[in-house]
Amino acid sequence: MATADKMEAGRQANRLRSALSDAVMRIAAKVGKAQGRLRPADIARKAVGDFVTKVDLRSEQQLRRELTKLQPQAGFLGEETEVAGLDNDWLWVVDPIDGTSNFARGLPHFAVSAALLFRGQPVLAAIHCAPEDALYTAVHGMGAWRNRRRIEAPRGRFDDGAILGCQWFRGQQDMRFLTQLQSKGARIRTLGSTVVQLADVVRGRLDGNVQQQGRLWDFAAAGLVAVEAGLRFTNWHGQPVFP
């Protein structure tokens, strides 16, 4: 009976992964078409160096409607709109456009990201990375996929040829840390999207990604993809971000 229950749970997870994938791809298609039609009036500043567009807002609203239908008992946390049900066991965490500044300037490095958490642990994820027009998905304990094919991350290199993605580094202390990395031969890349950079680590285009800070919607989905692809995803003390 336990085996049958496990098989049924796996089938349900794959059905939900497929539905989430379809929702993210629909949003990604609309976001891609909208990029070339942005006007200055469509872009607003939230804070220094932080922007939001009308496309962000529309995309998050549509994702909220679709994901709520998939898992009605789940709360919702998005970057751009009000939150709901944060105390629920289940929680959708969404970033409609990770890399909005790139998107607003016509640059290709942005992504659509959505994850379903159960009691704080990501269990389902889907991200669409615009630079490669690729869909990444993951299910906790079942693996990761790229364009619906299983993917395992290659082993990164950490010698003097390592190429590392970096995000959210500011201030003198952060700059000293980056200088230390570079003194050991690492080459630094900042693409402006945590999701895109983590996907590049999964693909082996980057050997790792480090960042000083981030919000849950920045890494919930991409972090699960990375872990299910065989990578370590830790805090500064080497502890798993999601135990």
Q: Language-model features: where?
A:
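Short secondary-structure junctions
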Residues: 39-44, 144, 184-191
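Short, Asp-centered acidic motifs that coordinate Mg2+ and/or phosphate
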Residues: 75, 124, 207-208
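Generic detector of well-ordered alpha-helical packing
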Residues: 57, 80, 96-99, 130, ...
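Residue-level signal for inorganic ion chemistry
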Residues: 27, 31-35, 56, 67, ...
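DPxDG-like acidic metal-binding loop motif
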Residues: 86-145
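A structural micro-motif at secondary-structure boundaries
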Residues: 146-153
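N-terminal subdomain of lithium-sensitive/metallo-dependent phosphomonoesterases centered on the IMPase/IPPase/PAP
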Residues: 1-97
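An extended, acidic
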Residues: 154-243
